[in-house]
Amino acid sequence: MTLYKRTDESCFKDIKNFDYMCHFISNIVDISDKYSDFRIAYVDENTKGKSGTIVCIHGHPTWSYLWRHLIPIAIKADFRVIALDLPGFGRSDKPLKEEFFEFNNYRKILLKFIDKLKLENIFLFLHEWGGTLGLTLPMENARVFSGLVCFSAYMGNNITSVSQSYLNWISTNIESDELKDL
């Protein structure tokens, strides 16, 4: 039984203005041992940066490429910059089973990512769904976080439901023939 799909690297050969080395981390999905080889892709630039570590978490339907204009500016300010591809996006593996698509699973993946890379002095840069996820991270280990920038994010609070228009937008992204094969 196939649990996920891996996008061939040739799909990214014509990407412009994104000449950063791609790294992969695995063994950070807790829902089943069957996902032990599931890979999360990320770029990690200026690893010796002295100003802190910017961790960029994108939203729908984009990937780490979203941060291509921010990365050189942050490097110039001597930040280490990590831009990851959430599961299902960019160079990360694409889950195929519904069991994977739980908020708490994505959240745990992000926490393990931070832990495995031993990140500290983190400044989160959060976009859309990345903001919804990322805003829950500092409460787990506040000492490693130094700040955050959040834009175009849905702030879930368990009191109000997600709007139907937002759900329709997400559904359109998931069901779009143009996005299915990415």
How would you name each of these model-derived features?
Residues 65-82:
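Short amphipathic alpha-helix adjacent to the substrate-entry channel of hydrolases
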Residues 35-39:
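Short, mixed charged/polar active-site loops
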Residues 23-33:
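Short acidic-hydrophobic surface loop/beta-edge motif
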Residues 2-24, 40-48, 53, 60, ...:
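Flexible "cap/lid" subdomain of the alpha/beta-hydrolase fold that forms the substrate-access gate
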